[in-house]
């Protein structure tokens, strides 16, 4: 039996699930009557981690965004993983909206999480390791209590827990 138990906290989005969600969203958009004959596109830029929506009006962009978010939720990707960065005019009188996938644990949120863990007086130690936080303890029960605490923080990130040893 191990004397030290640990897990990692990170903010990751499974890009394969995002691709699958966008494919099902494209199928739904193609089948919907309100998008017949209109420009309605959904594209993923994996490298930059952006989703681009293109349609004829603000209402249609909002409908596209709702479809994409509902498909992402069905694929267990939380809506906090997406923020709309900008809307701008595109060619042909269309509008273009850009959605950013938030999947990095920045230093500000890392510090918030470690401070909350230390303030909770749970017998664990938390260390920031780049884009991850390693939490160690002698008791698995303390680690599970720490997971509950972090889930209750309501951060605007898709928090995931991995490598529970």
Swiss-Prot record:
It comes from the Bacteria. Pfam families: DUF520. InterPro entries: DUF520, UPF0234-like_C, UPF0234_N, YajQ-like_sf. One of its GO terms (molecular function) is nucleotide binding. Keywords: Nucleotide-binding. One of its GO terms (cellular component) is cytosol. PANTHER family: UPF0234 PROTEIN YAJQ. HAMAP family: YajQ (MF_00632). Nucleotide-binding protein. Belongs to the YajQ family. This is Nucleotide-binding protein Ccon26_01810. It comes from Campylobacter concisus (strain 13826). The lineage of its organism: Bacteria, Pseudomonadati, Campylobacterota, Epsilonproteobacteria, Campylobacterales.
């Amino acid at each position: 039996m191990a004397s030290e138990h640990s897990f990692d906290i990170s903010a990751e989005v499974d890009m394969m699930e995002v691709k699958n969600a966008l494919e099902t969203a494209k199928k739904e958009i193609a089948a919907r009557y309100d998008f017949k004959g209109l420009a309605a596109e959904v594209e993923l830029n994996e490298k930059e981690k952006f989703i681009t929506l293109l349609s004829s009006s603000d209402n249609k962009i909002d409908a596209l965004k709702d479809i994409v978010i509902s498909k992402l939720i069905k694929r267990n990707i939380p809506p906090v993983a997406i923020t709309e960065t900008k809307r701008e005019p595109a060619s042909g009188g269309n509008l273009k909206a850009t959605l950013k996938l938030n999947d990095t644990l920045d230093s500000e949120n890392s510090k918030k999480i470690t401070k909350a863990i230390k303030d909770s007086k749970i017998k664990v130690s938390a260390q920031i390791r780049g884009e991850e936080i390693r939490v160690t303890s002698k008791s698995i029960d303390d680690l599970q209590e720490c997971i509950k605490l972090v889930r209750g923080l309501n951060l605007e990130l898709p928090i995931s827990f991995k490598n529970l040893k």
